[in-house]
Amino acid sequence: MYHYIEDKVFLKDMKYLCSNIINQLVQLINNDSLMEVKAHLVGSGAKNLITQNSNEPIDLDCNLMIIDSEININNCREIKEYIRKQFNVILNKNGWNDCMDSTSVLTTEKRHFTKGNHTEFSIDLAIVFNDRNGCHRLIHEKTGVTAWDRYYWNSVPDSRNLFDKVAAIKDEHLWDEVIDEYLEKKNMYLRRQDYNHPSFNVYVETVNQVFNKYFD
């Protein structure tokens, strides 16, 4: 079952290392002329939402949000390929291997610290953008034949005004309820063997549930 990471030293070191790599990626892309992006760990604005399933490796979920793009926003294949190549530049520069292109994220190799906590961890980088309808996540649907693969934007349900809802919850000092409910939902989907709810979707679902309970 999922639990929150209690080793604060390990958590701090892992977040520092991975955030540094992601920040380098953001700077590399923003210094180019094709795209403007920003990045954040899923739920990291509120902290304390990094989970681990039993003793398995930790997936550090990060959203790379497109703010502006010279590449047509609907050209999902070109967008993902551009970001994948830039990500590999940064990973290689830091001594990491190339990332893997999965359906909804770019996944790094698993790493671990040589001192202290030896738990393995990796970065799962999702490519997203926001519009008036909410948040959309870039999907690469693989067919087995590269030329036939599909790339498209998948809407995250009920993600409209997410940041405003988070701010309202924090202002009323209700974030502990989000922390409790988020973990409960992660374990609920695990028990159901439902693997169609990425961490960000669970986060959005949790924020909406708490917001609707107190503000709707």
Task: Place the predicted regions along the sequence by residue.
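Helical scaffold of the NTase/Pol beta-like nucleotidyltransferase catalytic core
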Residues: M1-L41
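Right-hand nucleic-acid polymerase module
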Residues: K115-D216
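Short glycine-rich, low-complexity/disordered patches
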Residues: Q24-V42, N92-T107, R192-E205, Y214-D216
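Conserved catalytic core of two-metal-ion nucleotidyltransferases
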Residues: L28-M35, R77-N133
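Active-site nucleotide-donor binding segment shared across nucleotidyl transfer reactions
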Residues: I29-L60, L64-I73
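Predominantly extracellular/lumenal beta-strand repeat domains
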Residues: K47-L49, I67, E81, C99, ...
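Intrinsic-disorder-associated interaction segments
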Residues: H3-C18, N72, C76, N196-F200, ...
